[in-house]
Amino acid sequence: MEVHLKQERSEKPSFWGDLAISFPSLKGAPSTRYYFECEQILYRDFFPGLRGKLLLKTDLWNEAKNTEILGWAADQGAQPVGFDIALDLVRQAAAVFGNHRFTFLNSDVRHLPFAMNTFDLLYSMGTIEHFPEYKLAVAELFRVLKPNGTAIIGVPNKLDPFLRPLLVYALSLFRLYPYGMEKSFTPGELQRLLESVGFRVTTRTGILFMPGWLRMADLWCHCRVPWLTAITGPLVKIFAAL
């Protein structure tokens, strides 16, 4: 395991660092398994032939707390590089993947420590919406991706039929949403944002098609009352089958 721990100046590390320490693992929950299956489909569809490809992933939340998708990508032959703004998340991810040769860094997506045209593949799922400088972030992602590279960039869908953005807004009003600021985008808004920094958008798609309340309820049950996932699990499977 190769791990670089490099502090970056930012307003966010204390928030995400505190969350890394206080937040439980979501691994093993039925909705997390569904999330992992969705990510595998994305990789197979848009990152064919992973072997030998240098893959950059923004944030290490999923590696520390969730789907561990980088481990699966490494098993397919990719050469993963991941970074996170929170040093504690970097350390937790490093502990999970101690038997793999990854490069993990403590860094900020708005100021990446990589040269231009470095990566073959780029995966960013649920990162850029958590701060106002999302345009700076996608410009940095475009800068470090090779000209013939492929990126998967995902954000919350403002047109979610299950009204997740409204749920997040309501929870945030009462300080019940743990992930801080979270901006949602329509598909058109995201495409215009990406094209404004140079990306060429070829496909629009989505993952984790289920109500936000069900995902939250399933995770709460998994962490607090595990036997209740016998109820949430079948509900998750219904949406996974749609």
What are these regions (language model features)?
Residues 1-51, 150-174, 215:
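Conserved class I S-adenosyl-L-methionine
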Residues 32-34, 172-189:
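Acceptor-substrate binding/catalytic loop of class I
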Residues 54-111:
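Class I SAM-dependent methyltransferase SAM/SAH-binding core
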Residues 123:
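A conserved beta-strand element that flanks and buttresses the S-adenosyl-L-methionine
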Residues 135-150:
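A short glycine-rich, Lys/Arg-flanked "PGG" loop and its adjoining helix->strand segment in the class I
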Residues 168, 203-242:
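A C-terminal cap/extension of S-adenosyl-L-methionine-dependent methyltransferases
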Residues 181-198, 204:
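Short alpha-helix
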